[in-house]
Swiss-Prot record:
Name of this chain's protein: Large ribosomal subunit protein bL36c
Record bears the keyword Ribonucleoprotein: yes
Molecular function GO terms recorded: structural constituent of ribosome
Natural source organism: Gossypium hirsutum (Upland cotton)
Superkingdom of the organism of origin: Eukaryota
Encoding gene per record: rpl36
Sequence similarity: Belongs to the bacterial ribosomal protein bL36 family.
UniProt keyword annotations, A-Z: Chloroplast, Plastid, Ribonucleoprotein, Ribosomal protein
A Pfam cross-reference name: Ribosomal_L36
């Protein structure tokens, strides 16, 4: 999980989701997991 100021999709499989007011990216590739900090 990477904590970033700006999150974006890295590949086509990445999904942007809003959870508890935070934007997170989930993907089948674990390296693409991100969260806005």
């Amino acid at each position: 999980m990477k904590i970033r100021a700006s999150v974006r999709k890295i590949c086509e499989k990445c999904r942007l989701i809003r959870r508890r007011g935070r934007i997170i990216v989930i993907c089948f590739n674990p390296r693409h997991k991100q969260r806005q900090g």
